[in-house]
């Protein structure tokens, strides 16, 4: 994990400059670059970002428990969940840089790639991006899979 994230850190500097010049270009480049780096289909990453945030880089969501307490938060294009922050703190992931589109896409690709590594390159691993692998969240995972597949197949038909 350390090597992958260090690679991400060094790749991000030129991408930061590119995004200042042309945000639309850099977003497309970021999905492609993250896909190559983590061996994940860039169209799948873009489909997830579409479902998660409607491609809004400043998207923010609070996840609440049954009594209305905030238990976690989701940030940016890929809606990176705050539970990852402790694991990524040594790489300076915080509530400011998480909104940078390229950085956010790379983090999302890392999460998805981790799912593929642990549970196989399949739709269940895609569903776990949002709902985890728990038996308790199986229905939510299936619903999420359908949403992502719908976007993904529409993108690939065009």
Q: Where would I find each of the regions flagged by the language model?
A:
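Detector for methionine-enriched segments
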Residues: 1, 11-12, 78, 155
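Sec-dependent signal peptide recognition
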Residues: 2-6, 10-20
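N-terminal signal peptide c-region/cleavage motif recognized by signal peptidases
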Residues: 23-25
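Catalytic glycan-binding domains that act on GlcNAc-containing polysaccharides
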Residues: 27-158
């Amino acid at each position: 994990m350390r090597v992958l994230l260090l690679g991400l850190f060094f790749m991000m500097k030129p991408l930061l400059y590119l995004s200042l010049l042309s945000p639309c270009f850099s977003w497309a480049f970021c999905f492609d670059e993250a896909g190559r780096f983590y061996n994940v289909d860039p169209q799948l990453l873009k489909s997830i970002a579409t479902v998660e945030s409607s491609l809004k880089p400043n998207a923010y969501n609070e996840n609440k428990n049954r009594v209305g307490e905030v238990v976690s938060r989701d940030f940016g294009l890929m809606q990176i969940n705050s539970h990852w922050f402790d694991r990524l703190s040594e790489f300076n992931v915080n509530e400011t840089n998480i909104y940078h589109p390229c950085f956010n896409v790379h983090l999302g690709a890392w999460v998805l790639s981790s799912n593929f590594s642990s549970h196989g390159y399949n739709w269940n691993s895609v569903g776990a991006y949002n709902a985890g692998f728990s038996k308790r969240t199986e229905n939510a995972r299936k619903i999420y899979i359908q949403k992502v597949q719908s976007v993904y197949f529409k993108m690939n038909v065009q």
